[in-house]
Amino acid sequence: MESFFNSLINIPSDFIWKYLFYILIGLGLFFTIRFGFIQFRYFIEMFRIVGEKPEGNKGVSSMQAFFISAASRVGTGNLTGVALAIATGGPGAVFWMWVVAAVGMASSFVESTLAQLYKVRDGEDFRGGPAYYIQKGLGARWLGIVFAILITVSFGLIFNAVQTNTIAGALDGAFHVNKIVVAIVLAVLTAFIIFGGLKRVVAVSQLIVPVMAGIYILIALFVVITNITAFPGVIATIVKNALGFEQVVGGGIGGIIVIGAQRGLFSNEAGMGSAPNAAATAHVSHPAKQGFIQTLGVFFDTFIICTSTAFIILLYSVTPKGDGIQVTQAALNHHIGGWAPTFIAVAMFLFAFSSVVGNYYYGETNIEFIKTSKTWLNIYRIAVIAMVVYGSLSGFQIVWDMADLFMGIMALINLIVIALLSNVAYKVYKDYAKQRKQGLDPVFKAKNIPGLKNAETWEDEKQEA
């Protein structure tokens, strides 16, 4: 029966990904050129913006919005996904993860700027995302509802099953904890957080992400430094394998590219339409500011966290064997001793659980787009908890396959939409660039963009940043 479901999922997934990679890279390159290599020219600017506070210290700050999206990004894709990519696609998959991220940073700027532009008020806070800019920018509420359903099901349900599946595997491998016990504990913790709303999501995200990411990066640096003589050889292997000069595992260069793209997109979410839901929550003076913040998020996720995992694994073996997290655990055990599996299990628990929390919020804001209803929201919360339990107990491969399918559908819709709305995002960017050239801290007003409609949040003379 499971093989039947695997086939049912893999056939449409393979078809979508066959073409999605070219759209992903093509649009990323288009945005990169159209916006003048914005992800490189404004790289330092991103760090300036990330520390800004909202006026009067009300609402969600730029950094808090960054942590919400980072909570979703920094999870299984960074540890399990990278290991899976290397095991199935070889070292070259890492190179294509870098390529997808580099061009995807421009896509992330566009989608997150649009999310800020078309956000709506929610009490003292804001909410928004692709569903909102599809309705307001394209006038297609029906498509917004389709996207809202997709992201609610995929992130709140499917992707959370992926996260808890990895948690259960890591805890079983390190401590031999019964998966039923893991499922119960995760269900209780998840319920406590998600019934607390946005404030509790923010609190958990900004606590877990910086601490665990910092520790993980330091360990990766230690591994690289202590294996510095082997490091140039690893880089050479990555490039040679990526370009087809050196085959390490079975399959051609096309397979390596697709595997790298899939795992990279699952981790950094550039162009997928997920991070814009976090970007919309921030109180900022200009929509482009969150575009830059989420662009930085893609860099942080792929070039820092994912790359750390890749080097940890490849300095251990260029042909690792095993499923996901077990590969990373074995590599760390080789580098830093017997306590490594314990560390990686705890790190995986915290990273993945923060992703569960961030993923939940993406679903919540889209439930509210479809219909503001406490009943439907509570039904969704119960469904999230049920999928947390399911993921803890289910098989490994079918969960990843379901994630790949839903991720592909979401990305396809969002990429088409942001391509159609890219001219609007470009005008917003030019407004920001003009003010920065004048030495100003940019403040956006909708009237500065002729013909701009449905950006009600930015129509006031004085913006509440």
UniProtKB/Swiss-Prot annotation:
PROSITE patterns (alphabetical): NA_ALANINE_SYMP
Annotated organism of origin: Bacillus subtilis (strain 168)
Major subcellular site: membrane
The protein's name: Amino-acid carrier protein AlsT
Subcellular location: Cell membrane
Superkingdom per UniProt: Bacteria
Similarity comment: Belongs to the alanine or glycine:cation symporter (AGCS) (TC 2.A.25) family.
Bilayer topology term: Multi-pass membrane protein
Entry keywords, A to Z: Amino-acid transport, Cell membrane, Ion transport, Membrane, Sodium, Sodium transport, Symport, Transmembrane, Transmembrane helix, Transport
PANTHER family linked to this entry: AGSS FAMILY TRANSPORTER, SODIUM-ALANINE, AMINO-ACID CARRIER PROTEIN ALST
Molecular-function GO terms, alphabetical: amino acid:sodium symporter activity
